[in-house]
Structures are given as structure tokens and as C-alpha cells.
């Protein structure tokens, strides 16, 4: 079985458009720099076609073993497809342990099936940057920035909690001195002025505004009876049947003659009803002959 079995056919439509865009990002100048670097480290010739020379994974495994000895334990020299894919997989695992980020690493099919040579080139450039960071003399890639860690004593860290950073703005030298807890009473006087004893509770401070001389004298608790007369005038025993003008006018109406709710009410006035003068039944003056009585059989 030859490696041509894994080569894909031509792409069409959207797949062809994506493949062309990826191919346009491929940098041939970077390819030449990577070729010189890999050949200089391994001492082996890659060949005319750069990607085809790396396709079996043998040179890649030897290359990572030079950068990090013992990274790949076994390198398959066979021409079988699965052996070549195994070499590429071992190379990917080795550079991951070496420090290359997973999102910078290509997939095995990107190289073996010629699907994304641009990603393969990006992975080799990331490997060059990591090698330069570790101290290898490489003319390819960019050296990663080193971490600048700072360690502070616990006392310094505690002092920093009391400082308001300029990123939060400025408090214009204001403080919370004299502030009380949420919901507690706040005094509206200054102890430095000798007015520690507050005024009586009946006096409304000017800081609260003015009540225009009004007071709560004569006010009663909610729900209690309120007298609508002046005690000084001796009007405590007024007639409770009279409706005060403060409540409106009843137009002279009263409840005289009204009965308790539910009792029968007489709908006639005795002044307009005459008393009968003829003798009633059973009285001596009653004429019994004027009436006919029949026995009910």
C-alpha cells in the first residue's frame, strides 16, 4: 500500500475556495528559513519539496530529539502509511511537552494528506520561537517574553488594601469619619461644639426645614376619638343628636320615629287616622240582625 492512497482528490466549490485562501497565506521565505534550520540541526537533506520531505515524520522525530533528547523513543523507518502517521503523532506529542501551545499545533492529516500546509508551517515557526526562548541559537521565529514575577511580603500586601488606586478615581480627601452603620441613628450636631445634649424631641431643627409655626398639640393617637370642640368653652356635654356643620347639613332631617333595624315600621300617622264611633262585634249596642250567619256543612 502506497502513501498515494491517502491523498485526497481535487476540491470543488467552497472546499476549493478555502484551500486556495490557506495556500495564499503560505510564506515561501519562511519555508527556506525553516529548511536551513532543520537541515542544520539534523544534518539530513529534506529534498526539493519541503512538505513531501517531512511527510513520513522521520526527519521531524529526529529534529525534536536533537532539541529535546529522548522525546521520541522509537522512530519507524517503514514506508507503511500507519507507521508514517505514527511518527507524525509522536512528533506532535513531543512538541506539546516541549512547550508549544496546543492551538499552534497542526493535525496529522494537515501534513500527511496535504490539506493545510500553512498550519504545518505555523507550527514549525512556533517551535522555533520556543527553542529560541529555551536558549537555542535560531534565526527563525520570535523569542517569547519571559515572565517577570514579583513576590511581596504579607505585610506589604496588607498595606496595599488600605490604598485606593487611581484607577478607581479619587475621593478628594474625603473619609468615612463619623459615619455610622447602615440603619443606625445619626446625630445632627457636632460634639466639638459642646452640644452633646440634643434638643428636645418636640423641636424641629432648621436642618430639617421649617414647620411654619405648626405643632402637634392636640393631636391624638391614630384610631382614637378626636374632640371637635374647644374644652375651654364648656361644650363637653353638647347634644350628640345634632349634626355639626363641620360634618355637613342634614337639611333638618332627624331619626325620630326610626325603629331598630329588623322591626316592623308603621306606615301611617295617628294624627291623620280617625277613631271608629260605631259599636264593634260583641258589644251590647251591636245590631246582630244585620248579619246573616251560616253554618258550614
UniProtKB/Swiss-Prot annotation:
GO-annotated cellular components: actin cytoskeleton; cytoskeleton; focal adhesion
Residue positions where Phosphoserine is found in the record: 175
Keywords from the named record: Actin-binding, Calmodulin-binding, Phosphoprotein, Repeat
The protein's name in its UniProt record: Calponin-1
Protein family (similarity comment): Belongs to the calponin family.
SUPFAM superfamilies: Calponin-homology domain, CH-domain (SSF47576)
Positions bearing Phosphothreonine: 170, 180, 184, 259
GO biological process: actin filament organization; actomyosin structure organization; negative regulation of vascular associated smooth muscle cell proliferation; regulation of smooth muscle contraction
Entry's Gene Ontology molecular function annotations: actin filament binding; calmodulin binding
Calponin-like repeat ranges, renumbered to this chain: 164-189, 204-229, 243-268
Pfam families attached to this UniProt entry: Calponin, CH
Primary role: Thin filament-associated protein that is implicated in the regulation and modulation of smooth muscle contraction. It is capable of binding to actin, calmodulin and tropomyosin. The interaction of calponin with actin inhibits the actomyosin Mg-ATPase activity.
Gene name linked to the record: CNN1
Subunit structure: Part of cGMP kinase signaling complex at least composed of ACTA2/alpha-actin, CNN1/calponin H1, PLN/phospholamban, PRKG1 and ITPR1.
Amino acid at each position: 500500500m502506497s502513501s498515494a492512497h491517502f491523498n485526497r482528490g481535487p476540491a470543488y466549490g467552497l472546499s476549493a475556495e478555502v484551500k486556495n485562501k490557506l495556500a495564499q497565506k503560505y510564506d515561501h521565505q519562511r519555508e527556506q528559513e525553516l529548511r536551513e534550520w532543520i537541515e542544520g540541526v539534523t544534518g539530513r537533506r529534506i529534498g526539493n519539496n519541503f512538505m513531501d520531505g517531512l511527510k513520513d515524520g522521520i526527519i521531524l522525530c529526529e529534529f525534536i530529539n536533537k532539541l529535546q533528547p529522548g522525546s521520541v523513543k522509537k522512530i519507524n523507518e517503514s514506508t507503511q502509511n500507519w507507521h508514517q502517521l505514527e511518527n507524525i503523532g509522536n512528533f506532535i506529542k513531543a512538541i506539546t511537552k516541549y512547550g508549544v501551545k496546543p492551538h499552534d499545533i497542526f493535525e496529522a492529516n494537515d501534513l500527511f494528506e496535504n490539506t493545510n500546509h500553512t498550519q504545518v508551517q505555523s507550527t514549525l515557526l512556533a517551535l522555533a520561537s520556543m527553542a529560541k526562548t529555551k536558549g537555542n541559537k535560531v534565526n527563525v521565529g520570535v523569542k517569547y517574553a519571559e515572565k517577570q514575577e514579583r513576590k511581596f511580603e504579607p505585610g506589604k500586601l496588607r498595606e496595599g488594601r488600605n490604598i485606593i488606586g487611581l484607577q478607581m478615581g479619587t475621593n478628594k480627601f474625603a473619609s468615612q469619619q463619623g459615619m455610622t452603620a447602615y440603619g443606625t441613628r445619626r446625630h445632627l450636631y457636632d460634639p466639638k461644639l459642646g452640644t452633646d445634649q440634643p434638643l428636645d424631641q418636640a423641636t424641629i431643627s432648621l436642618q430639617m426645614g421649617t414647620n411654619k409655626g405648626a405643632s402637634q398639640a392636640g393631636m391624638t393617637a391614630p384610631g382614637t376619638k378626636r374632640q371637635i370642640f374647644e374644652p375651654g368653652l364648656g361644650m363637653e356635654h353638647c347634644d350628640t343628636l345634632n349634626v355639626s356643620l363641620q360634618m355637613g347639613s342634614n337639611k333638618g332631617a332627624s331619626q325620630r320615629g326610626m325603629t331598630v333595624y329588623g322591626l316592623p315600621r308603621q306606615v301611617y300617622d295617628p294624627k291623620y287616622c280617625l277613631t271608629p264611633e260605631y259599636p264593634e262585634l260583641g258589644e251590647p249596642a251591636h245590631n246582630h240582625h244585620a248579619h246573616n250567619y251560616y253554618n258550614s256543612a
